[in-house]
Amino acid sequence: MQAQKIRIKTGIEVLKEQNFRCLEGKRVGLITNPTGVDNRMRSTIDILHEAPNVNLVALYGPEHGVRGDVHAGDHVTDIKDATTGLPVYSLYGKTRKATPDMLKDVDVLVYDIQDIGCRSFTYISTCLLYTSDAADDSLRV
């Protein structure tokens, strides 16, 4: 097979192709940053928020925030997302661990962050901490 004919699909592309079936009827929390995009560079936040059969209820931002507007090393605060109006919980603020209050309205967590595999990046540890928190609260990831 020639490399030019190989098409890589990200998770959001697969979810779109499946019409988000696995998220239907669930309250969805999204852990993401600006790397969470589809093949047209549309934000996963906006895609899930606009999908009629997805109930996106909360966003979770790692270092740099969900929209990438926080400098490296700065603490990220809990805010409302200006575009969607959804609550944005910081994963890089006063606590690096999810509190029960952060997860109380969520049935399933979607993690959409690309990582380069560099040990100085905090995204992989964010994934580990939140999948652990999800398991503790019987949430699906």
Explain the meaning of each model-derived region:
Residues G61, Y111-D112:
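Redox-cofactor binding/interface segments in oxidoreductases and associated redox assembly factors
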Residues A72-D105, C118:
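Glycine-rich oxoanion-binding loops at beta->alpha junctions
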Residues N55-E63:
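Short internal beta-strands
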Residues D115-T126:
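Glycine/threonine-rich flexible loop motifs
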